[in-house]
């Protein structure tokens, strides 16, 4: 019986594999935090996840005026009329929160 030393697991390799595993766990946890993100504007609680913020950006881009209004489904699933100004503020808060989450606790 011979030993295949090419299959030996070094402490460096083990550390690299653990670092990769830690990073993958962190990414899943980070995405869960982003998916659950909510922000409040004028007493209205908006979903702040990536899909919702893309929708906000679409409405803002298509608006003629910040006073324009549209129906919006809030985080609690109530449909209300909101202004583009409110959506813009919700987008700004969501983006800032997501940016803070994005690198918080990143494994080395």
Which residues fall in each region the model found?
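A preference for well-ordered globular domain cores
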Residues: 1-108
């Amino acid at each position: 019986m011979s030993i295949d030393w090419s299959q030996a697991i070094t402490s460096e390799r083990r550390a690299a594999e653990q670092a990769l595993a830690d990073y993958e766990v962190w990414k899943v946890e980070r995405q869960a935090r982003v998916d659950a993100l909510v922000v409040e504007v004028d007493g209205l609680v908006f979903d702040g996840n990536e899909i919702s913020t893309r929708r906000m950006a679409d409405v803002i881009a298509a608006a003629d005026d910040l006073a324009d209004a549209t129906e919006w489904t809030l985080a609690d699933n109530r449909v209300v009329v909101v202004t583009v100004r409110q959506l813009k503020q919700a987008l700004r808060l969501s983006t800032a929160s997501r940016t803070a989450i994005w690198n918080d606790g990143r494994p080395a």
